[in-house]
Amino acid sequence: GCLRFCLVSVLVMIIAFKMLVYFIICLLTVKVTSEVVDTSHGKVAGKLFKSFIKNVEYYGFLGIPFAAPPLQDLRFKPPQDIEPWDKVLLAKNEKPACIQFNTNLLKGQRLGQYGVEDCLYLDIFTPGTDRNERPVVTFLYNERFQNSYNKTKDYGPDFFIEEDVVVITISHRLTAFGFLSLEDTTVPGNAGLKDIVKALEWVKDNIGNFGGDPNKITLLGSQGGAVAADLLLHTGAKHLINAAILQSGTALSPMYLQDNAAERAFLLGEQLEIYTKNKEKLLKELNKVSASDILSKEVRAAPKEFYKENQKSVLTFGPVVENDSDGLLTKYPEDSTEKINIPIMIGQTSREGLASSLNYLTRPTDLRYINKDFPFLLPMRLKYKFDPNHDAYYEAIEDIRKFYFTKNKITEKSISDYITYVGDVLTYYSINKMADMYSNSSSRVYYYNFDYYSDLNENKNNILRMSNIEEGTWGAATGDELCYIFKCPRLKDKLCISVTAITTNTKNKIKFIFRGGSHTRNVIFLLRIWNFHKILNCINCTLIINNKIKIK
């Protein structure tokens, strides 16, 4: 029984990559009728859709509340219980995203502020409500806990639906609204993470009524969503997760788990002309300020020189380690001693540094300024901590320059070297280390690298359109695998033509075969064993996804 469950959980994780072969897709979404389902809080009515490729009918239940609206005095607090409803809730339209400020040019979204504070809702897409044994994929996607793109206009569930998998998307609070902390029990922080936990609890209690198995829940996180999933696996909420996929993100990245959380809250207050050193007064006044004003001022609330002194990027608000022993996240993941005995797929794209290098791809001459102000971003929590007031700090920078940059020189021709460096320090080092940590904690870890390129590589193609040079832009950019596992409506013109990509023959090869009933612990892929990741002598442990899919 345990072995069978583990194998099924792994199957859920790798179904995503089976979808690499669907490239001829025509948009067809039809509202036909509705379905009413009982939940722990009341009845909900969804609507019927049809999928892209096979016209498979499925139900969508959109905008189901899982917590009380986080308004007024609840603005920065952990999520509270939602009141039950008596009438049938019409769950037929998606709710707005959580309030955020979009600066990402790559997604084609409207720049600036959008979203609302009343945003704690989830969406469920199911092939049917007739039986409660389908695997469940819960999708989390945010970028650095500042922006979120997990609505159907961004990523649709069709490909999973056609594999008879239930898909759930969760909206959680972002920026200061989700991660302001006063470092006390009044506002301990991590409200956005606690939103996810609240939603997962609701899913655990109710997904059986939507055709899903509450014991087959896979958390699929991309970028900041992967960080959130990673963090939750190191908390008491891990029992809500039966398997996990971490795409291009872990909590070990130098971008996350910032210090000085309360100081940041007071700096935000000063930006909003709230001058006080009293936490209760600060909270009271912040609750009176408009959400728009908070969002526009929070970027200025990072401590001065924080970037240089702490080897971290300047994200004003994000997840924190809580001081309260009863909090959600009370230890750094690397200090956790808990066993995490579930299947985990973890990996990255081949050129994670592309998006972070966009400024230099558009203005290569600006690279010369790096000679004077080198971005020293080695993850300090992985024993790479250096004091900028000591010679060792500058000696380390010199060693890095010698290792990454040809002849130790950074010029406008160094863009390829810079992309490699940024990808390593912000993503690859921390992902490799986290894979090692999970391996040591008894988890069954499957490691992959996505290196495929076609018209479906949305981020890479947008980067190329904005770049003035192509040097160093080989491979796949961060997030490029998403449009191979989810329907991307904005690429429908690309999806409705034959793309030069993995052929139908590859479709027949991409099959994971499980030896039911035997004692093997590994996966058979392309007639070769995809071994668990391990620290030393790891042979056939990495799945390479490109034109010639292979294991090495």
PLM-predicted stretches and their roles:
Residues 195, 223-225:
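Active-site loop->helix "elbow" adjoining a glycine-rich segment at hydrolase catalytic centers
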Residues 226-237:
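Short glycine-enriched nucleophile-adjacent loop
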Residues 212-222:
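Alpha/beta-hydrolase fold nucleophile elbow
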Residues 26-193, 214, 493-509, 513-520, ...:
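Non-catalytic accessory segments of hydrolases
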Residues 188-207:
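Alpha/beta-hydrolase active-site loop
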Residues 420, 428-546, 552:
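Mobile gating loops/cap/lid regions near enzyme active sites that modulate substrate access
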Residues 1-25:
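Classical eukaryotic N-terminal signal peptides for Sec-dependent ER targeting/secretion
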Residues 108, 198, 205, 238, ...:
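Substrate-access "cap/lid" subdomains that shape
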